[in-house]
C-alpha cells in the first residue's frame, strides 16, 4: 500500500479515525479514487497504517537531522522509488512516480509533523 500524503493538510490522527469508522461498516470491498477496487479491506487498511507509520518515522528522522527540505524530500522519494521497484518492478515504479509526485508526500508529512511539534 502506497498512500499519498501531499500538503497542505495531511492529518494522521484523522486518517486513523476515518479508517476505524469505515472498518465499523465492515465493507467487503473498497473503491479507491484513481486506484480501483481493494480487497481484502482489512489487509488494505493494515498496509495503509503501516505505510503511514514507516513514512512518518522516516520524515521525523530527517527533520531531526541536517540538510535542506529539498535534500530530504529527494532522499525520501528515492527510497520510496527503490521500495516500489523492489515490490512491483521498474515500469510500475515509473508510473507510480508520474502519478503521485512522492516528493510532495514528504512535504505533506513534514508540514504535519512540524505543526504537531508547535502545538
Specify the residue positions occupied by each region the protein language model found.
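Alpha-helical context
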Residues: 6, 24, 28-31, 35, ...
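Divalent-metal (often Zn2+) His-rich catalytic cores of metallo-beta-lactamase-fold enzymes
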Residues: 13-69
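C-terminal regulatory/interaction regions
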Residues: 58-119
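Residue-level detector of functional hotspots within protein domains
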Residues: 1, 16, 95
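Surface-exposed cleft-lining segments at the edges of enzyme active sites
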Residues: 1-9
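Conserved phosphate-coordination/catalytic loops
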Residues: 9-13, 100-103
Amino acid at each position: 500500500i502506497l498512500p499519498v500524503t501531499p500538503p497542505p493538510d495531511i492529518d494522521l490522527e484523522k486518517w486513523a479515525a476515518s479508517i476505524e469508522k469505515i472498518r465499523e461498516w465492515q465493507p467487503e470491498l473498497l473503491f479507491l479514487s484513481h486506484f480501483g477496487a481493494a480487497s481484502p479491506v482489512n489487509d488494505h487498511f493494515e498496509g495503509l497504517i503501516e505505510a503511514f507509520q514507516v513514512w512518518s518515522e522516516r520524515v521525523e528522522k530527517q527533520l531531526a537531522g541536517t540538510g535542506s527540505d529539498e535534500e530530504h524530500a529527494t532522499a525520501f522519494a528515492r527510497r520510496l522509488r527503490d521500495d516500489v521497484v523492489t515490490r512491483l518492478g521498474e515500469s510500475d515504479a515509473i508510473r507510480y512516480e508520474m502519478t503521485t509526485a512522492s516528493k510532495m508526500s514528504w512535504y505533506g508529512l513534514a508540514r504535519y509533523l512540524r505543526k504537531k511539534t508547535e502545538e
